[in-house]
């Protein structure tokens, strides 16, 4: 079993890495949506019949 200090180290590493990974992921997703909307402006909003 890992000792308590080792688990604490992993927790601190996760807490400091997760927001960075989430920010990068959301930035890439937003960029894809923005570029898709730039090339195909009417496809994101489907009109009702």
From Swiss-Prot:
It is a single-pass membrane protein. It is found in: Cellular thylakoid membrane. It comes from the Bacteria. GO terms for cellular component: photosystem I; plasma membrane-derived thylakoid membrane. The chain crosses the membrane at residues 14-34. GO terms for biological process: photosynthesis. Its main location: membrane. Keywords: Membrane, Photosynthesis, Photosystem I, Thylakoid, Transmembrane, Transmembrane helix. May help in the organization of the PsaE and PsaF subunits. PANTHER family: PHOTOSYSTEM I REACTION CENTER SUBUNIT IX, PTHR36082. Belongs to the PsaJ family. This is Photosystem I reaction center subunit IX.
């Amino acid at each position: 079993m890992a000792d308590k200090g080792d688990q604490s180290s992993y927790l601190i590493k996760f807490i400091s890495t997760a927001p960075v990974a989430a920010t990068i992921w959301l930035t890439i997703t937003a960029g894809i949506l923005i570029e898709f909307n730039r090339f195909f402006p009417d496809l994101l909003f489907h009109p009702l019949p």
